[in-house]
């Protein structure tokens, strides 16, 4: 059996060497010739997998180590009898850590208290739903917009217009849909961006085209009160340099790039392939994940809640480092820019998640205990 895989997928040998030969390629350069003789294709979001890539090949299973599937032509898969699997939720915790780290940075810049802001989460799937639970656990006011879940479940959801008009912070976590009843391509265009409240913060860690990048650039040129945090870009790996300069935080699509999340994504498609082939799983992710470098954090019962929040979040991740690395890589040469974008992702340093972080409290501190629990830490 021949497996063709994106070279940036972690733990390929550990999970898949038992199935046959593995050939690695840069994800953006995968073409029909590369996959012609493959039985299994393993990709990330940078590879468009459609009829043009697969027609005439032997591929019968496609696995993507991502939450999103907008790069997969699922209609063609159905027509051609190709089985597929994604990795829903694999990097959700990493994205939540990214958002929390970004909020801490913006709060320090603006001199505001995070508990006093109103938060709007657009898209309450694996990532957005987890973010909502964390924010609720912290006791912060959260409004949620998700028309698909609202139609299916009912519940306390609000419209996008309500989010824009009432929320100080808006975090986007929708898939990219160009058609259908609820398209998300340019979900925030010129008209929607114009409705942002004074001093609003906008975070996009979903897909670049969910926000009209040209309209956002024009807004930021006109409104210095608005902060934008972008991890995803229209046309990436090419980046609008002026927009990047106007963003308060700018990063190269690494919000979900925690070590745990990336390896979890590989494990998910391995499990799906085992089911497809009807074989038992022989490899367990828990046996492959290294121990976190930070074993435990200790807090005194008198610790200020804001200080504790910042300390716990930044103990595992601080987006300012990635922002600085990204800005140093920006170039007026388009080819150099694209290469630098992908290189930052390929060589991304190990980053762990806050979930499961051991925290010891010295003394009775119910509010601190609640904060630790909300963040996903473990009291020891």
Curated annotation (Swiss-Prot):
Cellular component terms per the entry's GO annotation: cytosol
Binding-site residues, substrate: 45, 66, 257
InterPro entries for this protein: D-isomer_2_OHA_DH_cat_dom (IPR006139), D-isomer_DH_CS (IPR029753), D-isomer_DH_NAD-bd (IPR006140), Erythronate-4-P_DHase (IPR020921), Erythronate-4-P_DHase_dimer (IPR024531), NAD(P)-bd_dom_sf (IPR036291), PdxB_dimer_sf (IPR038251)
Active-site positions on this chain: 207, 236, 253 (proton donor)
Reaction(s) catalysed (UniProt annotation): 4-phospho-D-erythronate + NAD(+) = (R)-3-hydroxy-2-oxo-4-phosphooxybutanoate + NADH + H(+)
Keywords, alphabetical: Cytoplasm, NAD, Oxidoreductase, Pyridoxine biosynthesis
Pathway(s) this gene product operates in, as recorded in its UniProt entry: Cofactor biosynthesis; pyridoxine 5'-phosphate biosynthesis; pyridoxine 5'-phosphate from D-erythrose 4-phosphate: step 2/5
Record flagged with keyword NAD: yes
GO molecular function terms attached to this record: 4-phosphoerythronate dehydrogenase activity; NAD binding; protein dimerization activity
EC number(s) per entry: 1.1.1.290
Binding positions (NAD(+)): 146, 174, 205-207, 231, 256
Compartment(s) of residence: Cytoplasm
One GO-annotated biological process of the protein: pyridoxine biosynthetic process
PANTHER family, A to Z: FORMATE DEHYDROGENASE 1
HAMAP family: PdxB
Subunit structure and binding partners: Homodimer.
Family per record: Belongs to the D-isomer specific 2-hydroxyacid dehydrogenase family. PdxB subfamily.
Function: Catalyzes the oxidation of erythronate-4-phosphate to 3-hydroxy-2-oxo-4-phosphonooxybutanoate.
NCBIfam families reported in the protein's UniProt record: PRK00257.1
Protein name: Erythronate-4-phosphate dehydrogenase
Native species: Pseudomonas putida (strain ATCC 47054 / DSM 6125 / CFBP 8728 / NCIMB 11950 / KT2440)
